Regions:
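ABC ATP-binding cassette signature C-motif
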Residues: 1-217
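Flexible nucleotide-interacting loop at or near the entrance of a catalytic core
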Residues: 3, 10, 208-270
């Protein structure tokens, strides 16, 4: 069952293109890890999926009755509310015992402390508790393990494994990612690549994809050398077929330049 679709979405900040005409379907049972080098737009994509930011083009379509719960990198709160009030805002009153339990698991035992005096890490943990106290069908988590100690990470790992809904998250914790996901989506060079596996399996499949891309580029370079030799022999565009061959050569040369530029950028990112 499909619960949410990202349809032909594009987003640009200034001159930087984050993604171009990308699509993604989130299906029943998916626990997705969204990965990519810093600056590729992972957090922006989560915001668009959560509905807190608009794409330049395209749309996000939710299934009927599908509710989302979003953990942002920077929590928003009212200055005059305490931790428990913040976590329970908009929730059912009978969820309060569970809210207190989750806060305790996340190391926040003073539930009456004002949000505006908490440290950045405590605020993020309070926001995580707010996201989990009444889990929606789809959890959207941006760096959920930041500011968690090892016991808290293990608790969250078990929580997500037991969670019956769907998940898409960004995290730099590769061990956590490997343990809780069953699908990896990579944001790379403004495009999305989906792998039906956890992080360890993704590394193997990505290596295979990159080897295929290198083989394709090597084949293109070989053809390019042959065409260049043909042109240097003094070909004149005396016929439509010859002109078409020259045009194809120019197209291949431009494609080769673009492929090389992408490869050089990958080396810089590494």
């Amino acid at each position: 069952m499909n619960i949410l679709n990202v349809e032909k979405v594009s987003k640009t900040y200034g001159e930087k293109e984050l993604f171009n005409n990308i699509s993604l379907g989130i299906n029943s049972g998916d626990k997705i890890g969204l990965i990519g080098v810093n600056g590729t737009g992972k957090s922006t994509l989560l915001k668009i999926i959560a509905g807190v930011e608009e794409p330049d083009e395209g749309q996000v379509v939710k299934g009927k009755g599908i509710e989302l719960a979003y953990l942002a990198q920077t929590p928003l709160y009212y200055e005059n509310e305490n931790v428990l009030e913040y976590v329970m805002r908009g929730k059912h009153a009978d969820s309060q015992p569970k809210a207190k339990e989750i806060l305790n698991k996340l190391g926040i035992t003073n539930h009456g402390a004002m949000m505006n005096i908490l440290s950045g890490g405590q605020k993020k943990r309070a926001a995580l508790a707010r996201t989990l106290v009444e889990p929606a069908r789809l959890l959207i988590l941006d760096e959920p393990t930041n500011h968690l100690d090892n016991d808290m990470v293990l608790w969250l790992e078990q929580f997500i494994k037991n969670f019956k809904g769907e998940l898409i998250m960004v995290t730099h914790d590769r061990y956590f990612l490997d343990n809780v996901t069953n699908r990896i989506v990579e944001l790379d060079k403004a495009s999305l690549y989906s792998y039906d596996t956890n992080y360890s399996g993704f590394l193997e499949l990505k290596t295979q994809r990159e080897e295929m891309e290198r083989a394709t580029e090597a084949k293109r370079q070989n053809i390019l050398r042959k065409e260049l030799a043909w042109i240097r022999r003094g070909c004149q565009a005396r016929s439509t077929k010859q002109q078409a061959r020259i045009d194809r050569f120019e197209d291949m040369k431009e494609a080769s330049k673009q492929a090389r530029a992408r490869f050089d950028k990958q080396l810089m990112d590494m």
